[in-house]
C-alpha cells in the first residue's frame, strides 16, 4: 500500500468516523464555525503563508472529531469536559487544556466584548447549539440552569480547538518553510506529513478514529521527491557550490543558529530541574551539571549577529575581524571553563564528561528529585511523564550537554575554510588569529579526553550527512538489501537513518524473567535499523537480510530493564492498533553499547515532544521581548489602526490576510508594504487603481517616506552593560533569580528584533512594490522624466555602502536599475522585425504593443509578420478568392476570401485590444474631457469597430443588384462564423450591429432569400449578442486565449462602478445625481495638490477599486497571448483605411444617406422585387468559396476543428477564468407599426456602437500629423455615373486639407509623410453618390498603434508603440480635431462651439443602432441619447427593471428642424480652426431598454 493511499485513507477515515458519530449538522455549518478562524490563525502563526482549501477542510474534520469526542460523554459541566479533555490530550498536548481554561475565564470576566471577538462569539454560539442538540431534551429547570454552563462548555471546547489548530499550523508551516524545492504553501500533503511526524498529534488522531489504521505514519516524506536523485552528482554539485567565501559563511550562520536552538533545548531541561531544586545541595548539583552554558549561549548570539552583519551589510570579507573582536576579549575561554570543571571533594579540575555523568547519576538517585520523575504535571504542561522524562535525562541530556564541546570543532573547521577562501589579507590575518584561539581550546579537549575524539568525529559526520539529499539513495539501497520487505517504502516514510547494527534479542516464544538466561537457546540475533520514523528488524541469513518486522516510532514505548533482572537489556513495546501489542527484549554486549542504543531510541521517541516544549519556550521568550517601533510623532505610518483610518471586510483571503474595505492613503501604503505579510493581489490592485486618489509623484514620495524608517526613541537610549552572567536569554524563570536588570538584556534584543522584523521587511517590500510598478506600469515613468530621475537617484543611493543596507537590499536595487535600463532602451511591446534586406535595423519596430508585461521582462522574439503565442512552428496559408494580391482598389466584401477577412480583422482587433493599458480604464477616462489623451488605444478600438459597422452597412445598401446583396448577406454571415471560431467577439458584434441597423434590417427581400442554414446561423449570433450578454459570458468562461472579447461589456461595468460608488468614503453621502455631482467635486478638490494633506486623511473606498481592478484583470486575461496567424499587409492596409464617413459632415447625415439608399433598393410597401439588375461582380465572385480552409494549408486550427458555419462545442476548452455575467447597457428600440418581428431573430437588441472620428494628435514641436490614406471606393466607378438617383444626397463640399507641419522633435524632415490632395466634384441632387475620400496613405501598411500621441511615423518601418505624452501644469492640452457634430451643432457658429451648452450636448451624444424604429419617425440610426443619472437607481427597483423608453427623435424632414444647405460653409474635420475650438465629446454610458415596450 503506497503512502499516498495511506495518507488519503487517513483523511477519509476521519470523515468516516465523523459520519458514524451522529453527524448533527452539515459541513457548511461546521465551516462557519472553524474555517474563518483557521485562516486567521494561519496568518498569525505564519504571516503571508497561504493554505490550501483541502488542508483547511482536513483541519476542520480533525476539529470536528475532537468536538464529538469531548461532547460524546454528555458532560453537563465544564469541569467534566476538562477531565475528558485531559484524558484525550494526555500525551503531548496538555497545554491545550490549560490554555482553553485560561482563555475561557479571561473571556467570561469581560463584561463588554470587543469588536474583534464578534466572529469568535458567533462561532461559539453555533457550537453551543450543537452541544444542546447532543444533550437532548431536558426539563425546564435543568435547561435554564444549564444554559450558561453550555455556553461555558462551548467556550472551552472552542479555545481547545484553537490551541490544537495553532499547534498543527505551526508544525506544518515550519515543515513547509524548511523543505527544499517545494511550493511555499500549506497543502494537504504537507499537512499530512507534518501531523504524522508529530507523536502527540499521531496519538490524538489514533484515539479519534474508530477504524483500524495502517502501521505507517504515512504522508509524503521530504525525501520522497528525490527517488531518482543521483547521490554522486548531488554531492559533487554541493561541494562545488560551497567552495566560495559567501556560501561557507551562510553555512556557518545556519549551523550557529542550529547550535543556539540546541542550547535552548538544554535550557528546557534546566528550567524543569530547577523547578524542584530547593536546597543548596540541589542547586549545586544543577550548577555543576550545566556549568556556564549561559555564557556560551550569550557568545553564540554575538557570533550569530556578527555573521549576519558580515553577510547582509558588508560588501567586503570581514568575518575574521568580527569574530576576532570576541577572541581579543578572551571570550572563547568560556568553552575552556566549560570543558574543565572544578568539582569533587578535592576541588580538582575534571573533564566535563565525568562531571556530567556523575551529576546525572546523583540527580537520578536523589530522593529530592524523585517527584520530578513520578508526576505527569510539570512546568509548561509538558507531555513527558515521569518515566519518559527520566529516560530523557538519563540518555538524551548527556548528549545535549556534549554538543558545546562538539561545536568547538565546527568553529575550527569553518574558520579554516574561510581562511582558505578569503581574498582579503586583513581578513586572512584575523581569521588566522581566530584559528589559533580555537586550536588552544581543541587541544584542551584532546589532552583531557582522547577517547572523545571518536564521538566528535561521529557527530561531525552525522551533521554533514544530514545536509545531503542523496541520503534517499542510501535509504533505497537499504530497502533493496532487505529480502521480503513489506509495507510503504522507507524513502517515503523516513528522512534519515539514526543507527543500525546487530543486537541480541530474547526469543518472543519465551516468557521474560530473571532466570531466562539459564536457557541455552534464550537469545537470537537481529540486525536493527533505527530511522527517524520507523524501526526495521531483520535477521542475517548467509549474505542477506531477511525482513522480520517494522515498528512505527510514534506507536512504541521504550523501557530500561534493570541489570538485576537481565544485564544490559531494554524493552520495546508497540501499541499499534492495526495489530496485537508486540514486545521485544533486546540485549547489548556492554553498558556503553546499551547507552548508545537507548540514547537513539529515546531521542527519536521524544523528539516531537521536546520540540513542542522548545517551541513553547521560544514563544514565551518572544513575548518577553517586545517589538519596539517608532511612534506616530516620528513615523506617520505607525499610527494605530482605528475605525477612522481603516476598516476591513468580515472575511479574509485564502492565506489569512485581512481584506481592506476602506482606509486612508497612509494606511493603504502601510498595508501595501506591511512588515508581517505580503499580499500580492492587493499590490496588483493598488498599482492599477492608485491614480484614483493620488498621483504617481505622491505615491513615490509616500514610498520613500515609508522606506526611511527612523530608529525608535526607546532604542536610542544608552545601553547599560550587565555582568558576565547577564546573558541575553537570562530570565528569572530559568535561574530562579529574584531580580535582573532588564535594560541590559532586553534592549539589544529589542534593537535586533526591530531591525529584523520591522525595518528590513518593510524596506524590502517597498523595493518589491517599486519593482512591480516599473515592470507592469512603465508608462508612469515613461511620460514623466522627473519621476524617473528621482527613482534612479533613490536606487543609486540605496546601493551606496554608506547607507548601511543589507546585501539583499542592494541586490534588489541593482535588479530594478537593470530593469529600468532595459525599459528605456527597449520599451515593453516593441519588437524588431526584419526589413526588406532581411536585417533587423535599430529603427525597425513591430506591430504589437504588449500593454501588460508578465514575467521578468517579456520581449517577444522577432517574427516574419506572424502573430503567434509561441515560437511559430507552422503558419497558415493566406487564402484568396477573386481579388489579386496587391490590387487594393478591387478589395471588397465579395472579392476577398471570407476566412481571410476574418483572420486579418482578428489580427487587427487583437493588436488594438492588446494595446489597451490599465490607465485608460481607471476613473472611466474614456468619458472625460481629455479622453483622447488618456484613453487613445481604447477609443481606437471602438472607433474601428464603428467604422467597420458603417462599412458593412454602406457596402450592402450601395449594391443595387438583389442577387449581389444576397451574396453580401451570406458573406457577412460567413465572416461572422470565422469570427466565432477565432473567438473575435469584437468583430462579430461589429458585423452583427450592421445587420441589425435600421437600414439593413428592413431589407425583407434579402432576409427571406437566406437558406435555413444561414438563418440558424444568424439566430445563434442573435442569442450570443442578447441583451445582457449572458451567452457571450458563458462562452468566454469556456474558451482559452487567444480571444478578443467584446469591450463594451467591460466598459459598462467599469462605468457603473465608477459612477455608482464614490472614491472617497463620507459619513453620510447624499443620494441621487446631485449627490454624485457633489461627490465628484469633492474628489476633484481632494486631488488638488493644495489639499493633499486633507486627501491623505480621507477614507478611500478600496472595495470599489478592487471591483474595478477585477474587471481590468479579466481584460488582461486575453491580452497576454496572440494569434498564430499570418499577416497579409495589403489586406491589413485595406481594413485600416476604411472610412465610410469621410464624405459626411456628421454621423446622422451618413445614417440618413444609408437609410435613403435602403429605401431606394427596397421601397416601402413593395412586397416583391422589381426587375432584377445585373450584378457588378461576375458569378465566380458571387459564389462563396466557403469557410472551410483547404487541408493543405497550414491553419491555426486542427483538422478536426474546421471553420464552418456551425459552431463546434466550446466546452472542450478549459476556462482560465470564469467571467461573471453582468447586465449590458444595450439600448433597444420598439418595433414600428409597419414591420413585424422576424422569425430568424430571437432578440431584437441593438448592438452597442460608439462614434469616433479619426482624430489626429499633435504636440507642439514634436512630430507632424499622421497622413491620410487612400481607401478603395465602394461605389461603381463608371457604370453609375449616368444613372439617375432620386435620393437627395448630402453635399460633397471638399474641405482643404491642412498642410503637413514641419518635423521636429523625434521626427526628421526626411521621414515626414506628405498628405494627398484630391479634386472636388460638384454634387447635385441627381448625381451619383459621393465617392469615399481618402483617409490615410497607401504606401505602407499601418499598425493601429501608429496613432499614438508620441509615436512618430517612419517611411520604411511600422510605427512604434504607444507612449503617453508629458503633461505639465502650465501647458495646455494639445489641440484636438473635432468629430462630426450633430445637425444642431453644425448649424451653430464656430464662436459658440466651445460654449457650455454645446459641451453638454456633446457629452450627451452616443451612437445607437435602431433597427425596429417606426419609419415615419426614425428613418435612420439615432444619435443624441441623453445620459442616464450619475448614480444608477437601486437594484431591484422598478426603475432598474424597466427604465422608461427613449423619446423618439423628431422627423428630420420637418421644416422646424435645422437643415443643411449646399451653400452653408462646412469646415473639414482636419481644419485647424475646428481642431482648436471644438473639443471632442466624451463617450457616455449606454442606456437600458424598457422590457415592456
Swiss-Prot record:
PROSITE patterns: DH_2, PH_DOMAIN, RASGEF_CAT, RASGEF_NTER. GO terms for biological process: cell migration; embryo development ending in birth or egg hatching; epidermal growth factor receptor signaling pathway; female gamete generation; positive regulation of vulval development; Ras protein signal transduction. InterPro entries: DBL_dom_sf, DH_dom, Histone-fold, PH-like_dom_sf, PH_domain, Ras-like_GEF, Ras-like_Gua-exchang_fac_N, Ras_GEF_dom_sf. Changing residue 980 to K: In cs41; temperature sensitive mutant in which G1 cell fails to delaminate during the excretory system development. Disruption phenotype: RNAi-mediated knockdown results in 8% early larval lethality of the progeny. Surviving animals display slow growth, thin body morphology and both spermatogenesis and oogenesis are arrested at the pachytene stage of meiosis I. In addition, males have short and crumpled spicules. RNAi-mediated knockdown prevents multi-vulva induction in let60 n1046, let-23 sa62 or lin-15 n765 mutants and fluid accumulation in clr-1 e1745ts mutant. Residues 244-448 form the DH domain. Residues 897-1164 form the Ras-GEF domain. Disulfide bonds: none annotated. Residues 1208-1231, 1279-1289, 1350-1361, 1453-1464 have a biased composition (Polar residues). SUPFAM superfamilies: DBL homology domain (DH-domain) (SSF48065), Histone-fold (SSF47113), PH domain-like (SSF50729), Ras GEF (SSF48366). Residues 656-824 form the N-terminal Ras-GEF domain. One of its GO terms (molecular function) is protein heterodimerization activity. Residues 1067-1091, 1165-1248, 1263-1493 are annotated as: Disordered. Changing residue 322 to R: In sy262; restores normal vulva induction in let-23 sy-1 mutant. Keywords: Guanine-nucleotide releasing factor. Residues 1426-1435 have a biased composition (Pro residues). Residues 1079-1088, 1402-1417 have a biased composition (Basic and acidic residues). One of its GO terms (cellular component) is plasma membrane. Promotes the exchange of Ras-bound GDP by GTP. May regulate signaling pathways downstream of receptor tyrosine kinase, egl-15 and let-23. Required for larval and male spicule development, fluid homeostasis, vulva induction, spermatogenesis, and oogenesis by promoting meiosis prophase exit during oocyte maturation. Required for the delamination of G1 cell by promoting the loss of cell junctions and detachment from the excretory system during larval development. Plays a role in nicotinic acetylcholine receptor (nAChR)-mediated sensitivity to nicotine. The DH (DBL-homology) domain may inhibit the Ras-GEF domain, thereby preventing excessive let-60/Ras activation. PANTHER family: GUANINE NUCLEOTIDE EXCHANGE FACTOR (PTHR23113), PROTEIN SON OF SEVENLESS (PTHR23113:SF363). Interacts with cmd-1 in the presence of Ca(2+). This is Son of sevenless homolog. The gene is sos-1.
